[in-house]
Amino acid sequence: MKINHAVSARDQGAHLNKSDFGEGGIYPILYSFFDQNGALDRAAWRQQIEAVIQAGAPGIAILGLITEVSALSVEERRTLVTWAREDIADRVPLLATIAGKDLAEARALAQDAESAGANALIIQPPLNVKCDESELIDFFSGIMKSVSIAVGIQNAPEYLG
């Protein structure tokens, strides 16, 4: 599928500065950790953030495929964004991946991530829904129009469809 047009974050008023994203490099995507009761493990999450910052990561990405975002509840996703911003404490940029079952959910998650302090978003197609090109354009641009921070689209058709 080739998308010939899209709405960029810049078109929506977001302006990227090199300083927004550090010196460049690889942003690790964090894992989700759970305790023996199946709840998110805050201590393990914090330890992971400290480890990647101490190792020199120029930024951190969360809620990607490796985080098993599709297995997390909406509330768990919101919690991880909040924890990440608190634990990172503006030391490096935070990129939050947005995955929702539909546009309304994805838009709400994007706005929540922006409000929580994410520097940029990585958006995925709607979860478990097959979309044609026009529907994907509407979905992605609908999210982009709802936030003022930078947005990138994750392309992983073997996992996301």
Go through the PLM ranges and name each one:
Residues 4-161:
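Active-site beta->alpha loop and helix N-cap motifs at the rims of alpha/beta catalytic domains
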